[in-house]
Amino acid sequence: ADACSGLQGFLIFHSFGGGTGSGFTSLLMERLSVDYGKKSKLEFAIYPAPQVSTAVVEPYNSILTTHTTLEHSDCAFMVDNEAIYDICCRNLDIERPTYTNLNRLISQIVSSITASLRFDGALNVDLTEFQTNLVPYPRIHFPLVTYAPIISSERAYHEQLSVAEITSSCFEPNNQMVKCDPRHGKYMACCMLYRGDVVPKDVNVAIAAIKTKRNIQFVDWCPTGVKVGINYQPPTVVPGGDLAQVQRAVCMLSNTTAIAEAWARLDHKFDLMYAKRAFVHWYVSEGMEEGEFAEAREDLAALEKDYEEVGTDSFEDENDEE
């Protein structure tokens, strides 16, 4: 950072489930808050998949790290391995995706998010602007990430997708990087980052079409503004990789109450193990206290509650008060 003339912030890549990904990251985030208090910290967090598991103690690690980093992180983009596995199988016809396949998909998202810092465009969005537009309350900083088009090289020869098509596919649960259903939640904020051969007029038409759909709900206390970024640099892909070279792509970042589903799933798994105090001795022998588990779990329960509250309509609250 000392060699950097205009430090904007930090991008931190880690997993929730592993010991290093959760434990070391928590320590690092705390140190960064002390040493670089004002700089933004964006996380790309690999969230434990609902069905497949790499470690039995994933729920513990995830909840402990979320609790510890909640106040230190400005924005955390969640990605879950299972969602990406499914996308690789379904959209790219890869029977047994490897970590390389998964990482190439995630790297497209990171590339889209940072493109505005690196290239020129009609509407550029920088790192701090993301936070301003996506985070209505400090704790509610877990946007859902969707990317389109995800098509294999074979299929791209005979189909180039329009702006309207890639925009509408962003609202399909199948293209999301976390397993949850936005049709069950409400959108608080939405950011569309287009790149390649895209003009503002097409974007406006596409977004207007989305807003007429009834199954996409915004909270009533937030104007249904969609923040748009357009970058003229077309998406680049790894030569010989799985993804097709396309003329245009979009990455959607949306803050939706549906992501609370993911927390609820994780909390449930935590509760099942913690009720029996299973595996807790490993943590205690490393110097942790058992009380820290309960504290972290309470914080997550509060986070679920926060999501529930922001999703309720404001006129309901007024009626309650009367």
UniProtKB/Swiss-Prot annotation:
GO terms for cellular component: cytoplasm; microtubule. CDD domains: alpha_tubulin. Some glutamate residues at the C-terminus are polyglycylated, resulting in polyglycine chains on the gamma-carboxyl group. Glycylation is mainly limited to tubulin incorporated into axonemes (cilia and flagella) whereas glutamylation is prevalent in neuronal cells, centrioles, axonemes, and the mitotic spindle. Both modifications can coexist on the same protein on adjacent residues, and lowering polyglycylation levels increases polyglutamylation, and reciprocally. The precise function of polyglycylation is still unclear. It catalyses: GTP + H2O = GDP + phosphate + H(+). Pfam families: Tubulin, Tubulin_C. Its EC number is 3.6.5.-. It is an enzyme of class 3 (hydrolase). One of its GO terms (biological process) is mitotic cell cycle. InterPro entries: Alpha_tubulin (IPR002452), Tub_FtsZ_C (IPR008280), Tubulin (IPR000217), Tubulin/FtsZ-like_C (IPR037103), Tubulin/FtsZ_2-layer-sand-dom (IPR018316), Tubulin/FtsZ_GTPase_sf (IPR036525), Tubulin_C (IPR023123), Tubulin_CS (IPR017975). Keywords: Cytoplasm, Cytoskeleton, GTP-binding, Hydrolase, Microtubule, Nucleotide-binding. Dimer of alpha and beta chains. A typical microtubule is a hollow water-filled tube with an outer diameter of 25 nm and an inner diameter of 15 nM. Alpha-beta heterodimers associate head-to-tail to form protofilaments running lengthwise along the microtubule wall with the beta-tubulin subunit facing the microtubule plus end conferring a structural polarity. Microtubules usually have 13 protofilaments but different protofilament numbers can be found in some organisms and specialized cells. This tubulin does not have a C-terminal tyrosine. Belongs to the tubulin family. This is Tubulin alpha-4 chain. It comes from Gallus gallus. The lineage of its organism: Eukaryota, Metazoa, Chordata, Craniata, Vertebrata.
